[in-house]
Amino acid sequence: METMDNERRISTGIDGLDKAIDFLRPGDTVVWQCEHISDYMYVATRFVTNVARQGNRIVYIRFADHEEIMDTAALRERGANVEKYELDPRVGFETFAVQVHRIIDKETLGTFFVFDCLSDLQKYWFSDLMISNFFLLINPFLIRRQAVAYQPIDYEKHTYETISRIRKETPLLANIRTLDGSVYIHAVKVRGRSTPTTYFPLKITGTRWRTLTSSADTYAIFERFTQTSERRDCWDSMFDSVSDGREPTDEDGQRLKENILRCLLGNEPTRLALCRKYFSMRDLLYIKNREIGTGCVGGKAAGMLLARNILRDEAPELYRTRIEPHDSYYIGADVFYTYGVQNGLWSSRIRMVEAADYLEYAEPIRELLLNGIFMPSIKEQFLSMLEYFGQSPIIVRSSSILEDGFGNAFAGKYESVFCPNQGSLKERYDVFERAVKQVYASTVNPDAIKYRAERKLLDRDEQMALLVMRVCGDVHGNYYYPHIAGVGHSKNLYLNKQNASAENKGMLRLVFGMGTRAVDREADDYARLLNMDNPTAPPMVAYGDEYKYSQHKMDAIGLKDNEFETIRVDGIDKRDLKADPSLFMEPDYPTVSRLREMGLSTADAPNILNFRKLLRSTDFTDVMTEVMRVLEEKYSYPVDIEYACNFDQDGNYRVNLLQCRPLQTRGVGAAGVMPNVKEFYFRTSGNFMGGNVCLPIRYAVMVQVEPYLDLPEQRKY
């Protein structure tokens, strides 16, 4: 096991500084606050020269655009034990941080590290918060490896909050400036030791140095160091120059818009190309103004916004008259990483990525995610958002960076959580915070981890943003729900000879109430399945069985008990629907006929949720067909949507488009190849039940159809 003398004195290469801070020690990470990289090079060069002369191992972490801090080739020629690692921050925060961590871990105990300016990472991540997150992740590893590290930041490019987070964690923090031909160094934090002159400024002119202790000298220097102007986060600064919402006309403006597109909506190439066409600068500013924290809003949010903008531009009349507006909020992906860093789950996350049995670390990470705390500034923004929504029910939806992309949908892998949003502001906040943590924790559920592992995505940047939406619906007694909701595919994967057509207009799954019963299919209940080539065609069930194979339960938000509930639809027509019940249901006529034949009252005959009048008497199916057609055409790919609708007493309605993503028609693995077989036992054609597999068959069992059908239900199974 490697050990070191933690009290070993290490020179900075500057005598006056060594005297002021009582030298460096193993585990000291020094953050240099400077205005110009040349100031940092002054101290870094002297530090490297000194430790190289003593034969110490030196590692240079190179990632910035500024000039190189040290000439590793020249040092190596002089016999120095030096290594340069060139990294690209464009790979994303998580991947970049893991790369740096691996370098630190690989190097021997007590290695000396020199970093480029951390502030340059803003060019790639556009987030002040992520700069401090990176430091807070890497700093403990450096200390644990008893390294000595130099890391510069440009003091003027960071908010006070970022500087405060770094100051709190670094062992040493010092300012360095060049003024009037002299170098001034001022240590503002030295952990674990002090001398009578530690916190006095040091003036270096040529080879001479002196400590400035007189009030006149220190006033003159501190007055020039002091900055009273408010420091803007680089994220806010990026948007300040386009605050008027005008479209850019010059090359610099176009480049800035491209950066904003990538920062807000992600780098997935196919979707990004569509976003360039359908998002104006005004659209991007609107998203930014409704974002909590900073960073990408994630794939689900981007897909929803893109679909709405496509319809706005390509089908303006439909959009104006039939699409319900939304007022969603977005919790930026940077908040997820900040939450993880603040609550100490990073080490476990890295071990999970690198472990052979990655599920071993999932549960400990999940517990940390469920029981962490948020920064006060984030909590304040959460509260402000909840005040905006009032007591309208909301849903916290996962919107990870990779989610709903082309090739990796992550469908159903991450959670979404409904918040009934009733009670006092504190009660609503507590429920909302638990919902956020629950979605965060779903990033390490076994299904999600296996999905990422199968697609070799475990080491990819997968930050979790959140989409917070007002639930589409209305209050009906003690419950809140929309009249109808469901999912749609622009291509119908459930075809047979009878419903096949050359056009293939797609399909819808349709339910009464919350759309969860259409998304999360229930074994004991049924959604209405519509072939959009012939949407009014009755379900393919035997006469008299329509009620049996119809919807019997609905999902709703219980306002009285403040929870998501599943209730029976019996008697729903007698409740205050605020719409014509016959749009959605009609009497079960076979049952009515039987009751009449028996001379019994038909008053208690059940209704069937078959949506017959809705499908025959409104333009709902035409609208949904057009929505899916336009989106598929502009995506150049079949799409999968989620929707909900509310009706009024006159039959007017609007569609709330909740989600849009490329339709996943293939799983992992190679496509099957149909064999050219001339001799066969049996074959069939013309029917396709959606999804297919190619499996070796050992046995074929022939069942006599008529005797089988004569069996009672229990014997059949």
Model-derived segments and their meaning:
Residues E2-N6, S194-Q227:
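C-terminal regions of RecA-like/P-loop NTPase motor modules
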Residues R9-D65:
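Glycine-rich P-loop/Walker A and Walker A-like loops and their local beta1-loop-alpha1 context
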Residues G27-Q33, R57-V59, G110-F112, V148-Y150, ...:
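Residue-level preference for the first positions of well-ordered beta-strands
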Residues Q54-K123:
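Conserved inter-motif catalytic segment of the P-loop NTP-binding fold
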Residues Y124-W125, M130-K157:
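Substrate-engagement module of ASCE P-loop NTPases
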Residues A147, I153-T207:
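Phosphate-binding/switch region of NTP-binding enzymes
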Residues E156, L272, Y278-L318, G372-Y717:
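Conserved mixed alpha/beta core segments that line enzyme active sites in large multi-domain catalysts
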Residues L284-R351, A355-P376:
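A conserved helix-loop-beta module that forms one wall/lid of the active-site cleft
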